[in-house]
């Protein structure tokens, strides 16, 4: 971890104490490690995985990549840079549900709930999707779907696999974009797994120093399928010029609006039901000018609270970074390992998440 990390975290704790003490007690009282859980990088995403076509590389090259991955993981511990602390009045809580376009026929939300397994089969460290053999992974997903169906009998549950298809890297690569694209064959393989459960497939994009405009169009042939949807991760959109993992990245409303327009055109062109767009978020600067995001009935937007930590910290982060800046629908991420990494922490149960207001309609497990 860089030496500046502890200073950054201390500044962040002070900032949160000033800004959030009244509305979000656990954010204000959090220890540096707990603050990092929500304001820091998620650790496991920057995996420096070689593309599937490059499996023939020498063992020495593989070891070098592993060493780089360890270095990138350590860099990912750094918290976001604190801004000058200015005490602001507590804003009134926005009204939910958001007033938006009437759902079109075939829309999934808000009358269904999506329960997804996140990750990449080339790495056990990036999430549960790649941690287990396919059959076992799908059986575990079945159990979660059953648990959510039991917890909320009025909302049908749809299983999903959330595959990271563009992976941020800790090195520039040949084209200097600091990201690796997964092969079509890998995407087809995971799509096949989803088909075995009549599940959705989400394609998740970490652009590194590339752009959404460059990374999403190559996925068009998959997104043209009615059961394939999209996720975009601001954490690894490095407009600052830093390497992924050194700073938390960001998207602006303009980036989201471009993505919505692109997906809407695909819906019209292919005469398919509306798409779901998942946007990860666990700090305020990750998504700027959210009030300027345009809603379109052909694309349903989910802001997914993506921080790990204690249940109280996650609840307050949901309120601070998702509920307080309404876009359209909400999601909530649960980490099998990071959410229980400290004594006294426990994995939130479906009933715990359903107690949130508004109730998340997209649930992701990593």
Residues covered by each model-derived region:
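Signal peptide processing junction and immediate N-terminal pro/mature segment
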Residues: 23-54
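Polycationic, low-complexity disordered segments in secreted or periplasmic proteins
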Residues: 47, 51-89
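Hydrophobic faces of well-ordered beta-strands that scaffold small-molecule active sites
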Residues: 113-117, 159-163, 201-203, 226-234, ...
């Amino acid at each position: 971890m860089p030496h500046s990390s502890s200073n950054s975290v201390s500044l962040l704790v002070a900032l949160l104490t000033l800004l959030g003490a009244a509305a979000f007690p656990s954010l204000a009282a959090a220890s540096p490690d707990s603050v990092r859980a929500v304001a820091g990088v998620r650790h496991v995403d920057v995996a420096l995985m070689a593309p599937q076509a490059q499996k023939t590389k020498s063992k020495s090259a593989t070891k070098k990549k592993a060493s780089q991955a360890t270095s990138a993981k350590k860099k990912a511990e750094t918290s976001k840079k604190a801004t000058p602390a200015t005490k602001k009045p507590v804003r009134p809580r926005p009204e939910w549900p958001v007033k938006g376009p009437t759902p079109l026929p075939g829309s999934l939300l808000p009358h269904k709930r999506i329960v997804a397994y996140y990750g990449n089969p080339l790495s056990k460290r990036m999430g549960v999707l790649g941690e287990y053999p396919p059959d076992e992974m799908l059986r575990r997903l079945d159990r979660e779907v059953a648990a959510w169906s039991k917890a909320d009998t009025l909302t049908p549950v749809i299983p999903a696999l959330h595959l990271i298809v563009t992976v941020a890297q800790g090195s520039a690569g040949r084209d200097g974009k600091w990201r690796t694209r997964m092969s079509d064959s890998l995407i087809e393989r995971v799509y096949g797994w989803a088909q075995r459960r009549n599940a959705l497939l989400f394609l998740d994009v970490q652009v590194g120093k590339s752009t959404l405009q460059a990374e999403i169009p190559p996925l068009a042939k998959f997104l043209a399928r009615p059961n394939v949807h999209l996720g975009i991760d601001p954490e690894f959109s490095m407009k600052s010029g830093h390497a992924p993992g050194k700073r938390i990245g960001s998207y602006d409303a303009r980036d989201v609006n471009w993505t919505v327009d692109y997906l809407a055109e695909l819906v019209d062109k292919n005469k398919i039901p509306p798409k779901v767009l998942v946007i990860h978020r666990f700090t305020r600067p990750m998504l700027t000018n959210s009030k300027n995001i345009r809603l379109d009935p052909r694309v349903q937007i989910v802001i997914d609270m993506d921080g790990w930590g204690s249940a109280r910290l996650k609840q307050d982060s949901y309120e601070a970074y998702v509920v307080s800046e309404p876009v359209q629908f909400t999601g909530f991420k649960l980490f099998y390992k990071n959410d229980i990494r400290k004594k006294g922490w426990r994995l939130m149960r479906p009933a715990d998440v359903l107690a949130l207001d508004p109730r998340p309609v997209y649930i992701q497990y990593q």
